[in-house]
A protein has these predicted regions:
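Residue-level recognition of tetratricopeptide repeat
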Residues: 57, 91, 125-126
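Canonical tetratricopeptide repeat
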Residues: 63, 97, 131-135
C-alpha cells in the first residue's frame, strides 16, 4: 500500500513540475497571439505572467517594451528593453528600439555606442542601422 502511495505522489509531483515548465510557454504564446490581435492590455498581462514563471524570458520583456511603445510610455519601454538586453545582450531588435529612443531624446553618444554594438550583432535588421546613422548625420 505504501509503495502505491509513493508512486502516486511521485507521479503527481512529476505532473506538477511538467505543468509549470509548460505554463511559461503557454503564457508567452497566448500573449503573442493577443499582441498580434492588438489586445495590448490582455497581452501585457500574459507576458507579465510568463515572466513570473521564467524571469529570464527575454522575449516577454521585449514584447512588454513593444506594448509600452504603443502606449507611449517611454520610461517603461526603456526599462523593459534594458531587461531584455541584460538577459540577451545580442538582441538586435531591443538594441534598435533603444537607438530610436536615444534619437528621440537627442542622446547621440548613446545612439553611436548602441550602433557599434548593433553592427556586430545584426543579422536581420542591418538596414535599419544605416537609416539611423543617416539621421544622425543630418
Amino acid at each position: 500500500m505504501t509503495k502505491r502511495l509513493k508512486i502516486i505522489i511521485i507521479f503527481l509531483m512529476a505532473l506538477n513540475i511538467f505543468g509549470h515548465a509548460n505554463s511559461n510557454e503557454n503564457f508567452f504564446e497566448k500573449g503573442l497571439e493577443l499582441y498580434n490581435n492588438k489586445k495590448f492590455d490582455d497581452a501585457k498581462f500574459m507576458f507579465e505572467r510568463s515572466i513570473v514563471f521564467n524571469p529570464k524570458d527575454s522575449n516577454s520583456y521585449l514584447y512588454l517594451a513593444k506594448i509600452y511603445n504603443q502606449k507611449k510610455n517611454q520610461r517603461k519601454e526603456e526599462k523593459n528593453l534594458d531587461a531584455t538586453l541584460l538577459i540577451e545582450p545580442n538582441n538586435e531588435e531591443a538594441i534598435l528600439m533603444l537607438m530610436k529612443i536615444g534619437l528621440e531624446k537627442s542622446n547621440y553618444s548613446k545612439v553611436k555606442d548602441l550602433s557599434e554594438t548593433f553592427t556586430q550583432v545584426c543579422k536581420k535588421l542591418c538596414n535599419e542601422n544605416k537609416k539611423i546613422l543617416e539621421t544622425l548625420e543630418n
